[in-house]
Amino acid sequence: MSDLASEGSDPAERASEHSNGNAPADRPARRSGDQAVADAAERAKATGSRNIPVLPDLPLPEDTANLRLGPDLSPAMLALLPMVGVWRGEGEGNDPARGDYRFGQQIIVSHDGGDYLSWESRSWFIEADGSYGGPDLRETGFWRVGVDGDDEVIELLLTHSSGIVELFYGTALTQSSWELATDVVIRSQSGVVVGGAKRLYGIVEGGDLAYVEERVVADGPLEPRLSARLQRYIG
């Protein structure tokens, strides 16, 4: 387990703290359950009627990023249900060549009723003045849920535009937080050289999706690489 998995008691809150720079001691008082439900209903007024575009005339079930629309979610994917949607926001990155930087990001998590979730993430650099600074990272893949004895195993298969293919395995730490680590990293002939990684995702205060990625750099220890807090745009 990474250090992220040993700090504090709530993995989702830890992901949020790493993504916005707040210390654990700065946490606000917890809201009541009724207030959380009311806030979620208010957010759904803006996001609940949206969905991703789908090209017509295919005999297949349509992809949907909105659990209110399209095919029912497969029971096999209930452990990942809170992730379904489109998420947009900003984060902070650290690259050995570039140093610290800000980025914008959109993540699309959709399904077609099958026993997997589709995943697409695109990010872009944000300049010091807040302007667009060019494309950054792009990845696409699938989430699956396997079984190891009596335990569920979260699987994440990713292909990166940088020429990397990764297989992550992990677990659901709570009903709304998940931790994964790479089991295999494959580089194409033209791909960049990277080490293994760990990721922690969580649904945090306000219904946002927060995450932290740590990655091995130059055969060294795990180091913070990416963190972001994204707001729901669809779903």
Curated annotation (Swiss-Prot):
Residues 1-59 are annotated as: Disordered. It comes from the Bacteria. Signal peptide: none annotated. A motif (GXWXGXG) lies at residues 85-91. Transmembrane segments: none annotated. Coiled coil: none annotated. It holds the Pfam family THAP4_heme-bd. Belongs to the nitrobindin family. This is Ferric nitrobindin-like protein. It comes from Nocardia farcinica (strain IFM 10152). The lineage of its organism: Bacteria, Bacillati, Actinomycetota, Actinomycetes, Mycobacteriales.
